[in-house]
Design a protein with these regions (language model features):
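Conserved beta-strand scaffold positions in the cores of enzyme catalytic domains, especially
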Residues: 20-22, 74, 136-137, 157-159
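Short, surface-exposed beta-strand/loop "edge" segments at domain boundaries and coil↔beta transitions
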Residues: 9-10, 144-146, 166-170
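Helical hinge/lid and interdomain linker segments adjacent to catalytic or ligand-binding clefts
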Residues: 1-88
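Conserved hydrophobic/aromatic beta-strand scaffold that supports enzyme active sites
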Residues: 38, 147-149, 159
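A structural signal for well-ordered alpha-helical scaffolds and beta->alpha junctions
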Residues: 5-6, 109, 122, 174, ...
Length: 183
């Protein structure tokens, strides 16, 4: 998990029986960061009121793309700023902040949708994606993208604006079907 101080979110992984360690975004691409299967950017990563995590992302674009290409899963939650372009991702993605509740509407079927498996609607969202060239796999009640997936090489990037704790099924699936990759 990329973050600069302890988060309640970390306890979720202990509850799921999964290993979780926290790292600074500035450590991406260095020899000090251990290999992992899933790399998570929690909600608020670009909001300076919460963290400095967003600072290291721009210069880490190549490391993140290499991680995904080799088989890693990058799970990205909302930046929690009014508007945000994910310029460090290897695809186009633009976020607009707008808190709302919704019953997510699946678009096709994708393993990433397991992120909300067994979570009763309505779900909280803190925005939507105004544009993307990734595959939209969930939309809100107004038809706006709230989860997008881009498969790159052997891995994938999952970006979502859903503001709920992720379901265990998503991590079980990603841990089972991926290998540890150096970031």
């Amino acid at each position: 998990m990329l973050w600069d101080n302890p988060l309640l979110f970390e306890k979720l992984f202990v509850e799921y029986g999964l290993e979780c360690s926290r790292a600074l975004s500035t450590s991406l691409g260095t020899p000090y960061l251990p290999a992992c299967k899933v790399l998570i950017l929690p909600t608020g990563f670009a909001n300076k009121q919460y963290t400095k995590t967003g600072i290291g992302l721009g210069r880490s674009k190549h490391s993140l793309e290499k991680f995904v290409t080799k088989g890693g899963t990058l799970l990205v939650f909302s930046p929690l700023v009014p508007e945000y372009e994910y310029e460090w991702l290897p695809f186009s993605l633009k976020y607009i902040m707008e808190e709302h509740s919704c019953t997510p509407q699946p678009v096709g079927k994708h393993d990433a949708q397991k992120l909300i498996e067994n979570i009763d609607p309505p779900l909280g969202c803190d925005g939507y994606f105004a544009e993307t060239d990734a595959d939209v796999v969930l939309k809100d009640d107004r038809g706006r993208p709230i989860m997008a997936v881009k498969e790159i090489g052997k891995g994938m990037v999952v970006a979502t604006t859903i503001h709920e704790l992720p379901a265990a099924g998503f991590f079980e699936c990603r841990v089972a079907c991926t290998k540890k990759v150096k970031v």
